[in-house]
Amino acid sequence: MNKYDRFLTRGKPIDGSKDYAYGTLNIIEVCPSPIKIGQEDTDCNLYKITYRVPNTVADWNLPYPQKSTFVKPETVGRYTGQDDVLRNKIFEGDIVSFDDINNDRVFGIVIFNMDTLSWAIADAYKIYYDLCRASDMSIIGNKDDNKILLKNFEWNWSEYV
């Protein structure tokens, strides 16, 4: 794992692009207006991902050229440090499949388990699997692009996504 990968984050740009932006997440606090004119109070932070631009020349004494894009907060996911069988990076919010100890095919969503402070996979029955066997996993989608996959489960995924 690259030393910068532990900070790798992805998110969907607010401009409506279907592709994720990958890079370092910056959360910019925007002070809410002291006067509200009939508007709901929403998240007052802006989420921006900064990423490298290959094959360009840096300026302002930066070690490499950078660009930034604002992303939707609900699509932000952190890199887990693990790769799947095809060496794709596994991010928070990915939907994965793997064989459990009984060789049954399991589908679940990658979450950060706050009880154990570790990466885990929650399946349709709220059973948590450790992410340590990521080399046997396949990414089959993610929570943002494949909402139909989440509808097949019996319990409410909204507490995890």
PLM regions with names:
Residues 1-161:
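Secondary-structure transition motif
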